[in-house]
Amino acid sequence: MYPFNRTTSIHAESASQHIDELDDDDFGRSNGKFYSNRHSQMDSDVVAHQVPPGSPVEKTILASILEMSTINDMWVKTFTAPGANKKDKKRRESLFECSWRGVHCVSNSLRSILFLFRLLAIFPATTDRKSRRKRNHRSIIKLILYVNYIVLAVLLNSFLIKMNFKVLMLYKHKFGLMHTGTVASMITATKPVINVFVIVLSAIKFKSHQRLLKTIDMVDVCFRSAFGVSPPLRIYKFVFFFTLLIIFFSALILKVVEFVGTGEIFGEHILTDCSFILVPVLSLWNIIPLLYYHLYNILVRFYCRTLIKSMNREHKKRHFSLKFYYEQFTRITNVQEAVGDVFNPLLLFSLAWSLLVLCLTLYFLSEPTSTLLVPITPEQVTNPKIREKLNITVHVKICWAAYQVVMAILHIIIICSTGMMTNETTRQIVNAVLRIVPDANADLDRFQISCFVHKMTTQFMWGMTVWRAFPLERTTFFTLISVIVTYSLLLFRFKDDMVQNPPYMAAMAVFNTSAVPTPAPG
């Protein structure tokens, strides 16, 4: 399953003479301990196919993987002993086999992030789950409770959608559709709609999410065994949670400003009291899928760069065969395909609502009657105190709408940029393959190179795309930017014509009136 075959076998006698020439790649890590290929023996069946009998050889990566995959008898006896507790048995039956053996894997490092997801009822997953045949009544009860928790989160966001719709219709009835308060309410009302879609989609993609975690765990184990490296997940998690804290406290500060500016009092309404926690959580629901998608793209790019660095060192000394590199490249493409299976519908929906919010904002700003300074005029509300309070309320809604517009811009930029960088980094692997000097068996090398090239031609099937509608490339990003800029320039041009050329607009109004056919007298 893991044909990590060296191109040459180094004998033990010659290893001591050239010890200074060995790279750091000759070292690995197994169960938390360093091992050296110079001080180990291969399995008998592997030796028979690699070197003549009786030759002392170093331990290959295949033998190391087989050793890691072999369960320690001492631990097995401990877990299967009659006196073993339930925690040990549950640990032994873990979904990800390498997690309970102490081997590093991505799913174990992401436990804190997955726990946060379970609290927010999105992307349900667990790294310690029994098989379906061995589920007991306790696990079934937990599953039922979690499903109810997801339904409760959907109902909460549905209630917020209903309340926002009532406020939207109230502003539309009093001030019109293109009023500042109406447009701001429409923009802020997209937040619970997005949350409902994210919660429902993550529940539907439960199996795909589990498959993604298992796939990236397998790639991580292979790369740790072959190259002795692993992604700096502690740094990635720190950046992830630090970004969430910024989003959380920015929404909380804006809510406190709204509470003080509008003169609200604690205890008047339970929804107002709960909004100090509810509003920041709504913002987290919006941003977490984007950050999670970005995290997986960072991991994929890390494995791609590791493979490229190893290929670039092949000019000095051949360590691995092209078949080995192709197998690792295939594993990376499997991770990208699994990422797309989980996030593709979410990417399409995120780009859709982001463009909708931006276009609605630009259309509102291009209206000649739109004003942000005095949204409630004396002609609309004659009472000065009520008008002042309404102006403050609408200005707060403008701030929330601007907050959502910033989120929309971040979604467009991050989705396009991270997908573009992942696709370009993946293509650099083929460039590194083409720079490798062919070995003695040139025909086999040519075949492996053709496999690389053919696999890369099908990148639209497994690469970073938007539900295979279009790939995430530089052209995609610049196309979206050009569409938004062109739309805004046209709208603002029409606004200038309507303001600076009233006779023209009056003539157009007369022309439109005369163009309407008058009904014949009965």
Swiss-Prot record:
Has keyword Transmembrane?
Answer: yes
InterPro entries on file: 7TM_chemorcpt
Give one GO term, molecular function aspect: G protein-coupled receptor activity
Keyword Transmembrane in annotation: yes
Enumerate the PROSITE patterns for this protein: N6_MTASE
Its localization reads: Membrane
What GO biological process terms are annotated to this protein in UniProt? egg-laying behavior; G protein-coupled receptor signaling pathway; sensory perception of taste
What tissue expression does the UniProt record report for this protein? Expressed in some neurons in the head, the HSN neurons and the PVQ interneurons of the tail.
Q: List residues traversing the bilayer.
A: 140-160, 184-204, 238-258, 276-296, 345-365, 398-418, 472-492
Q: What is its main location?
A: membrane
One Pfam family matching this protein: 7tm_7
The UniProt entry lists membrane topology as: Multi-pass membrane protein
Q: Which GO terms describe its cellular component?
A: axon; dendrite; membrane; neuronal cell body
Specify the superkingdom. Answer: Eukaryota
Question: What does the record note as the disruption phenotype of the gene behind this chain?
Answer: Similar number of unlaid eggs as wild-type animals.
Alphabetical UniProt keywords: Membrane, Receptor, Transmembrane, Transmembrane helix
What is the documented function of this protein?
A: Orphan receptor. Regulates egg-laying probably by activating guanine nucleotide-binding protein goa-1, in the hermaphrodite-specific neurons (HSNs).
The record's family statement is: Belongs to the G-protein coupled receptor family.
PANTHER family linked:
GUSTATORY AND ODORANT RECEPTOR 21A, INVERTEBRATE GUSTATORY RECEPTOR
- The identity of this protein, by name, is Probable G-protein coupled receptor egl-47
